[in-house]
């Protein structure tokens, strides 16, 4: 106890002592005329001793409210005694050395930097200057400088720059003095004006004298000199001076010296400093040339290879990589033009816009690369992978609409009512009287018990439908338990139980000639799997040599085969018995897929492959072929890709986000750099080229063969770089010169056990989910024949990075110096001579949609479901744009039931305006399947709404393999404000449907446009809100007090509760200026739909909820489409609980289903489990969005339209009872 008391007394004594000393100094400062030099020297020495030995003294001097710093600085400013000055400088050094940040800021705020610079100026006037004073003073300035934003300006204005530089010049042999001087200069060089000033006064030459030649002495001085030099060389004037004096070669030689001698890696910072100097010099064109001429590429490449084994040397390898990539000569993309390889003549040429600009260029203009892409304005940081992703976009806050008058929705038809009457025929449900229909009333009797509501997803069980194929898949693929096997979903539709042999195809394509004859080129069959081709036959042709059966081995001569489009041909085991096409047997290079000869197992597989009706109820290969025949493409495709013909079954296994190994991107970049260093190792052979159809495939065994001449295919050119490495170039959208993202192509002729590297080298976006766990998709024909007919994620060593191919300013909006990006992935194929397909995402073609719609129409129950499919309009390419109407048939043809039928609110859905966003079609498929389902939930939904659906807004873009545009070369989702009936017919007429509904006072309750998002994870929505838009701007508070219904958030919040992939935290309801012409904003603003949304589905995967860390698949996308429907049913409860007269028991059962999430047990059967808790989504690495931005928005109170916040957690039945009780009272 006595010890504690003594310590306390000692602390009090110290505090009293420092206060006393400061009081003495303050008194001396007040009596400046009677300045006592000896006393001041004594007091400052005592303070220095206490500050040096006692932390509490330092705290007391800098504590809040203390005047210690002011007293010390005042004394420094007033005294002329050298020892007193040194004492005070030492005191300030002690204060700045410990807990430096806060105390240094305190010194700066009290004017410390200004006083010290004045002291430096006065001290420099003495001759000779005091060395100790200069060392201490510069040391203190070097500590204050980095914390003072205006230090560089203060130093230049006060004249301190010249003083410090002259000290260095005059004392090159005095490392102790010039070290703090260089530290001050290093800080001053952060100011570009200071850098230029110092360069003019010989600073660059002085620093090169210090850093060379190689020596191990004074390494600290060398390090600071290199840092200062690197800062100086950021000035282009200084960089040019360094190049003119051949300092680039000096730096490279010095770096090699340190690399050879620093074997223990103790001086890595010096080596990095040299690289930073090279990095600064190579910002200019002559610097890059000097670096290449000095053999810098090879030097840094070799040293980097030697450093890669040591993890601690990664900073050296990374900086070397940046320098080499910057100096790598900009290459021309090996294309004759960046315009699409396919041309389509528009009905008329627009007078303005990108298409007009594209075709106004003289033919002699080279649009692939600019005349001088290697300009001198290159910034060092532009080559870094952390490049600002929004540098070429307008600022987010500037993009937000601030004019409230433009935000207020108003129903602006824009067309006369007479003009809109043309759309009356698309709404037969509003005039149908059902007198000629044989309707059976399903009205429940009072007290009757209804059956349970089946799981609210896209399907319903029908155990009697055979499912042998799914069981076999389970046993073969992932050993699914018998319990899980029994839960697999049969079709939910009223399907025929007659199974036909539609899976006997061992081939990948059917070939159909215009004249109706079919030829078998046995060499193609044996080597490649005979291609599926399309014939438009007329009449029967005699079969000269007969058809090749599945068991016959074809010879090497073409065999014409009898064709008929209406009747079957007499070819046993033919897959196309009802159509004018034929397939040969699978036999790759004379070798069976896995065995030397056909085995009983192969025959068993073939038998099992025929039972596809049970798992793909909407897929019919024969029907697909018939539809493709009538699909019009610009390239006039005559082939069908195997996956589209045969169909896709979601795999049983989960596909996790890929974890990228450390250093894989760096390794790929170095391999690219090797192309310049070792050019003789590069094959550079074109093996596929749409621009040169005569470029035939090479016959060498070791060369892969490529093809994309089928619906939705996109691959323009392939160049073999090394034996197992290929550069791939994507085709631009038709009538455009960019939009390279979607790919879909075929590869064949591979070997097993070989790692093939594929580089797609003309990507445009500055980042991609391929860097964050996403993998491309592959479909293997041999895997499909082994009962695994699915797309699955493949690829290792995947990364996305900037490459050395220049982008023309004609494709970048006038910006020069842009580069393309590379997607690279490595694949080892499991089967020799397989035929595989690669895609950016799960393909979903226009013909697939037409097939699904026809199957839905033929399989639905007409007594329960009102289904109409009509052609809204014809596209530019001559393809029909379907529009679908789905609702429940009226209970009877009595007036009351028909009246209720006609007055159901509308739900308007659209999808696939961007062709590359194929996931939108899979979500739409889930929605359509659910709406056509036979469950009680689906029936309730149909009885609640009339669904008007345009499932594919851009058929031409989908057919022709575009990523974003239609044949007009424009983004259709930017044409909604003023669509042109000739150039944008699908948008014009879809908007016309909405305008018609608005004109007859039947504005839809919900509008939703399905999209895909390539840069973010999860599924989320963008909506429209005036209040939230204004809240994100700097508008005054008065404008934020506006009253706005919060019903726009109801549906997203419901989906957040029931859909595992949905993330409310990613949703945004801000209206941006750049999105004012999109469907979401136009329908909200002009049609007056408050709940107008864009629903974005990730192309990658999820980072929250049940699917966290998993890549998304078609079953999750279809589930999302079904969940959207369930959310609409919940929306009905929340907004109009009295309108839907379901018994409370039925509402309670459905509420239990809605408040849980789905667990997928088979490709199409969903089983319920407890919902996952919400996860707060981390800030996404990219704010870019093709359709909308994604700011973080706090959830506002009162989002639901019900009267109190507590109702968010109510069940549907509770809400209903609450409203009923409220009305009864």
Swiss-Prot record:
Taxonomic source organism: Xenopus laevis (African clawed frog)
Entry keyword set: Carboxypeptidase, Cytoplasm, Hydrolase, Metal-binding, Metalloprotease, Mitochondrion, Nucleus, Protease, Zinc
GO biological process: C-terminal protein deglutamylation; cerebellar Purkinje cell differentiation; eye photoreceptor cell differentiation; mitochondrion organization; neuromuscular process; olfactory bulb development; protein side chain deglutamylation; proteolysis
Positions with a binding annotation for Zn(2+): 914, 917, 1011
Places the protein is found: Cytoplasm; Cytoplasm, Cytosol; Nucleus; Mitochondrion
Catalytic activity: (L-glutamyl)(n+1)-gamma-L-glutamyl-L-glutamyl-[protein] + H2O = (L-glutamyl)(n)-gamma-L-glutamyl-L-glutamyl-[protein] + L-glutamate; C-terminal L-alpha-aminoacyl-L-glutamyl-L-glutamyl-[tubulin] + H2O = C-terminal L-alpha-aminoacyl-L-glutamyl-[tubulin] + L-glutamate
PROSITE patterns the UniProt entry points to: PEPTIDASE_M14
Principal subcellular localization: cytoplasm
Task performed by this protein: Metallocarboxypeptidase that mediates protein deglutamylation of tubulin and non-tubulin target proteins. Catalyzes the removal of polyglutamate side chains present on the gamma-carboxyl group of glutamate residues within the C-terminal tail of alpha- and beta-tubulin. Specifically cleaves tubulin long-side-chains, while it is not able to remove the branching point glutamate. Also catalyzes the removal of polyglutamate residues from the carboxy-terminus of alpha-tubulin as well as non-tubulin proteins.
SUPFAM superfamilies the record matches: ARM repeat (SSF48371), Zn-dependent exopeptidases (SSF53187)
Cofactor(s) of this protein: Zn(2+)
UniProt cross-references to CDD domains, sorted A to Z: M14_Nna1
Biased composition, class Acidic residues, residue ranges: 366-392, 1181-1193
GO cellular component, one term: cytoplasm
EC supergroup of this enzyme: hydrolase
Family matches, as Pfam families: Pepdidase_M14_N (PF18027), Peptidase_M14 (PF00246)
Disordered: region residues: 366-398, 1181-1225
UniProt key word Cytoplasm: yes
Family: Belongs to the peptidase M14 family.
Positions annotated as active site in the UniProt record: 1096
Name of the protein described by the UniProt record: Cytosolic carboxypeptidase 1
Disulfide bonds: none
A GO term, aspect molecular function: metallocarboxypeptidase activity
Record bears the keyword Cell inner membrane: no
